[in-house]
Amino acid sequence: MRIIRRISAVLIGFVFFLAGILKIMDPVGARLVVEEYLKFLHMGWLNGLAGVLASGMALLEALLGAALITGVWRKVAGLAVGVMTAFFTLLTFFLYLKNPHMDCGCFGEMIHLTHLQTLLKNIILLALWALAFLPLNKLEPTRKVKYVSFPIAAVSVVGFLLYSSLTIPLVDFTPFKPGAELMLPEDIDDPNDERTPTLSLSDASGEYFDDLLMEGDLMVVSIYDVAKLKPRQWDKIVKLLQDAAATGYKPMVLAAASPSIMQESTSAPEVLDATYYADRKKLLTLNRSNGGASYIQEGLIVTKWGIRGLPDQEKLQELASADVTESLLSENNGDRLKFQAFLLYVFAVMLLL
């Protein structure tokens, strides 16, 4: 029975840790999910804190998961996990009854569950929790070495949170991930299917130019919050657009704003002459970084950069001269390996140390 209780606790820990880490890797996506929950609960007045709430919840999930895996502070961690699981079970039961058009966001963009699937998942977690922690006064003592492995894992998770807040996700699970091929809105059966990578754009007069995304080598800068861009960031965008044009790319800016706001925000002709307008949520999905860039080759999303790491002209020339398949692999496999290495390292610390 002791082994069964320990295995149950570790299984819950894995679920919590993975759920937290996936949301930590994509803080913008986690914030969007929290905003959806706040809207559903009629608590939109808290939207200004959505980012903090999302990151805080993700960090708490990951740390509680690490605590269960390592076995430290079992009673406190067990109570906290039990309360959280019970709360989310009640919330998902309410979601199941109301069936709003929203995703649970349990595992970020990696895994999408229906409300019923989420409810069943939480019920299973509750059953495992009861098996692992009841009665609370009969929990096994923790090996002393685990009080060393947990802080190492915790510091690593916090460091990953800080890193993720400054970059785009190491692994992109959105419909607009590298390797995805854009589709025209008229070519899909269900226009409400958010998992299909469609992007519609128009000029200042409202005329649509969706076909432009299917033509040639595009360097697309996406701006979903014009007001938050600083002068030095505008300078970086202008430099990228100049370098892209000089290297043979078609520079394009997609903004979730009105033409008048764009003209008030910048006077650079490199930006204004290349600007089209698109849906804010689509731009957030295309690139999590406000002012980030995406290389699109004849409708194929090749790679992306955040505003802090925009490519220089030498990098653009390298990509332009390379085979698109090679670029797709070389530009994205490195980040995927970094994420896998991070997970292996943290799990090794928690399980083997």
Describe these PLM feature segments.
Residues T142-P169:
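Internal/C-terminal transmembrane anchor helices
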Residues G291-G306:
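A short, hydrophobic beta-strand/beta-hairpin element that forms part of a small beta-sheet core
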Residues H42-L60, L116-L120:
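Interfacial helix-start motif at the membrane-water boundary
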Residues K177-M183, G306-L353:
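Thiol-/selenol-based redox modules, centered on thioredoxin-like
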Residues A86-K138:
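Membrane-embedded alpha-helical segments of integral membrane proteins
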Residues R2-M25, A50-L91:
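Functionalized membrane-embedded alpha-helices
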Residues M252, P269-R288:
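Short, internal strand/loop/helix patches
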Residues G159-V220, A227-K239:
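Membrane-interface segments at or immediately adjacent to transmembrane helices
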